[in-house]
Swiss-Prot record:
The modification Cysteine amide is found at C81. It is found in: Secreted. Has the structural arrangement of an alpha-helix connected to antiparallel beta-sheets by disulfide bonds (CS-alpha/beta). The keyword Transcription regulation does not apply. GO terms for biological process: defense response. Beta toxins bind voltage-independently at site-4 of sodium channels (Nav) and shift the voltage of activation toward more negative potentials thereby affecting sodium channel activation and promoting spontaneous and repetitive firing. Is lethal to mice. This is Toxin Tb1. Belongs to the long (4 C-C) scorpion toxin superfamily. Sodium channel inhibitor family. Beta subfamily. CDD domains: neurotoxins_LC_scorpion (cd23106). It comes from Tityus bahiensis (Brazilian scorpion). GO terms for molecular function: sodium channel inhibitor activity; toxin activity. SMART domains: Knot1. Keywords: Amidation, Disulfide bond, Ion channel impairing toxin, Neurotoxin, Secreted, Signal, Toxin, Voltage-gated sodium channel impairing toxin. Expressed by the venom gland.
Amino acid sequence: MKGMILFISCLLLIGIVVECKEGYLMDHEGCKLSCFIRPSGYCGSECKIKKGSSGYCAWPACYCYGLPNWVKVWDRATNKCGKK
């Protein structure tokens, strides 16, 4: 019985960890946040500001891991960049 409870607890913990999202950060216009001419570590800092676990410059835009669900990330299906 203790083993079953431990197993279920582990599954719940894994479910909590997996719920983090990842993706390209967006600027105020809905475009991917550019890192083309930014200094090294810029994307990592921007991701940390958004409460992400890490990030890097996936040329030419910032890509983040471990973002909370409330952070909006760029999506091809809902892309509004450059459109009015």
